[in-house]
A protein has these predicted regions:
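Flexible, glycine-rich phosphate/dinucleotide-binding loops
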Residues: 12, 41-43, 138-139
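Extreme N-terminal starter segment of soluble prokaryotic enzymes
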Residues: 1-4
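Active-site and donor-binding regions of nucleotide-sugar-utilizing enzymes
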Residues: 69-143
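Short hydrophobic segments within beta-strands
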Residues: 6-8, 35, 132
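Conserved N-terminal ligand/cofactor-binding loop architecture of enzyme catalytic domains
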Residues: 20-99
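A short, glycine/small-residue-rich beta-strand->loop->alpha-helix junction that serves as a flexible
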Residues: 7-17
Length: 143
């Protein structure tokens, strides 16, 4: 069994928990692979934008708090899902999954968990997608 540990590359906040999960699963005898979400769907511009926004928000924590108070809601997640669930990114994911085998995904950010679930369902794949919220101050997808 191979588990893909998916993170959003915006700093250490999602990578470190994904790495910890990967290390523990490996210690238990499960094969794992660390996966950058934006590389899976081949979206380098979103990857760069996400990193720049997060670094900017770290410099201005009050702005980050105000933005994320509204951004980390179910309605916002649905809008993001719609944006990423385009045919282009689904095709990129399909191409990636043809060349890379995983039996399940564990995501440390809510956006990849929603999008990979949607893509897997749309493509008729039976790949379970698990979400592990590594954000300390917010609980995503709750209104």
């Amino acid at each position: 069994m191979k588990i893909g540990c998916v993170y959003v590359n915006a700093g250490k906040g999602h990578y470190i928990p994904a790495k910890a999960i990967s290390d523990e699963l490996t210690a238990l005898g499960t094969e794992t692979e660390m996966l950058d979400f934006f590389k899976i769907i081949d979206a380098p511009k979103f990857d760069a934008l996400n990193q720049n926004i997060w670094r900017w928000e770290l410099k201005f924590p009050k702005i980050e708090q105000a933005l994320n108070a509204r951004a980390d809601k179910t309605s916002s997640a649905k809008k993001k899902l719609k944006a990423f669930a385009s045919a282009r990114y689904q095709k990129n994911f399909s191409r990636w999954i043809e060349n890379n085998h995983v039996d399940a995904f564990i995501c440390t950010h809510y956006i990849p968990s929603l999008i990979l679930s949607e893509f897997s369902h749309n493509l008729g794949l039976h790949i379970p997608v698990f979400a592990y919220s590594s954000d300390v101050f917010t609980t995503h997808c709750q209104d």
